[in-house]
């Protein structure tokens, strides 16, 4: 989402933006113009010959891509239409869970951004949802239904109802980290977060939740508009997507989980001005490279914050990998209501397998 000046740029102007003379190295004259390489080492996982495939279209606001190994399917949400959908090779796209994030559990603005946003799996294979309209994090059995029964995991901090949980990840030691900006109170005419009698927390928080004892602690409230979250491979750092909705300066931040110190890993002001779009979802590849939405597509940086590549999917909300990182899956945006995938180079040796953190 975005302040009017920047979000209208991302929604209305993006389709007219041309590839600019940004200081990157073009490795070949015949590879797809959808891929821009800034550092050749990224070619270990990016295939310049890969084509971008459209898996789904006419999804009002796609988000929350999550690979379901059990069904060999991609799950994703449509925030505006309040549903979870499923895609696989055999059946294509189908409705999966409805309603997904606005069931009447909590008072909300009643505006469009009230469906479920991020998805994840708990240790038992149940589906975890960030429910923007219900203003909670909940779980449900991972199966198709149009009469869902959700179990609340957390819906308040110190007795005050959450804003509208947005993204959720799970650490290797079982803790849940989630962001809670107030996008459930976004006025879609002005693209501003509005005051509401229903809003009880006056900051945009990032929280740590212990599913065993239900303890909830505040990690930080110092990020003006936190969105996507991811953990570094060593689990020592929390990567935070700070949107540019208030200051037109989207960033990838790096929070030390021990000291809580926050540093800027990547400043996205320049590339957002160049290509449009804001910062949203984020995932970490097993190589340590960080994939995230921004700059009119998906940007890739290394763990030091160096820009490695840009893939022009159009304006995007989020991305995900399948089990073996064979494909990159991308969810579009309001002006780009599609779900895509692109084949990656495998970083695995024959006979080797990895476990992908589904955050």
Model-derived features with residue positions:
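Sequence-structural signature of mature extracellular/luminal beta-sheet repeat domains
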Residues: 24-359
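Bacterial Sec-dependent N-terminal signal peptides
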Residues: 1-29
């Amino acid at each position: 989402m975005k302040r009017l000046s920047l979000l209208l740029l991302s929604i209305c102007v993006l389709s007219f933006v041309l590839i600019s003379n940004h200081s990157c190295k073009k490795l070949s004259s015949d590879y797809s113009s959808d891929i821009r390489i800034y550092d050749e080492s990224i070619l270990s996982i990016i295939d310049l010959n890969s084509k971008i495939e459209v898996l789904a279209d006419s999804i009002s606001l796609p988000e929350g891509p999550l690979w379901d190994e059990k069904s060999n399917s991609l799950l994703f949400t449509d925030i505006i239409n309040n549903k979870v959908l499923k895609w696989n090779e055999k059946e294509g796209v189908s409705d999966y869970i409805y309603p997904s994030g606005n069931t009447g559990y909590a008072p909300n603005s009643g505006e469009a951004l009230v469906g479920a946003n991020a998805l994840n799996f708990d240790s038992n294979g149940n589906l975890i949802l960030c429910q923007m309209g219900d203003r909670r994090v909940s779980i449900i059995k991972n199966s198709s239904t149009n009469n869902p029964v959700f179990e609340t995991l957390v819906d308040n901090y110190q007795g005050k109802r959450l804003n509208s949980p947005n993204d959720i990840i799970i650490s290797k030691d079982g803790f849940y980290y989630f962001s809670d900006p107030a996008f459930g109170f976004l006025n879609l005419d002005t693209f501003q977060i509005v005051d509401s009698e229903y809003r009880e927390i006056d900051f945009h928080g990032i929280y740590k939740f212990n599913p065993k004892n239900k303890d909830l602690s505040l990690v930080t409230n110092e990020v003006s508009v936190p969105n996507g979250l991811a953990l570094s491979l060593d689990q020592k750092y929390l990567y935070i997507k700070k949107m540019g909705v208030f200051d037109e300066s989207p960033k990838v931040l790096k929070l030390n989980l021990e000291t809580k110190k926050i540093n800027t890993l990547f400043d996205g002001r320049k590339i957002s001005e160049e290509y449009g779009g804001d910062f949203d979802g984020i995932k970490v590849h097993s190589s340590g490279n960080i994939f995230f939405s921004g700059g009119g597509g998906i940007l890739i940086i290394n763990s030091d914050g160096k820009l490695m590549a840009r893939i022009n999917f159009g304006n995007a909300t989020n991305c995900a990998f399948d089990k073996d990182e064979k494909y990159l899956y991308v969810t579009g945006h309001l002006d780009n209501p599609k779900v895509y995938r692109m084949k990656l180079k495998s970083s695995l040796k024959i006979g080797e397998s990895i476990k992908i953190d589904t955050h």
